């Protein structure tokens, strides 16, 4: 079997670490996640984010999950400054870094 590092995220603010691979978000509040730099030795780095809020009615209104580039960097996510993954119930996003300031959805 293959296992990947999994983090059950409940705080409303988090900076992804070098150990993170899969981040499951169970908080019912709005969540801001900061990505590591897409330029510092991260070519090919993969991160997976999954809304695991456990209620069938979906996330409460106003409780977006925002994925943000590294603070103080010029990094982009799909050419944008931030990415909201909570547009649907139980939404997810997988990102990879090109090692040159960009994160891409796949």
For each predicted feature, which ranges?
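Exposed extracellular interaction/assembly regions and N-terminal maturation sites
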Residues: 1-69, 98-106
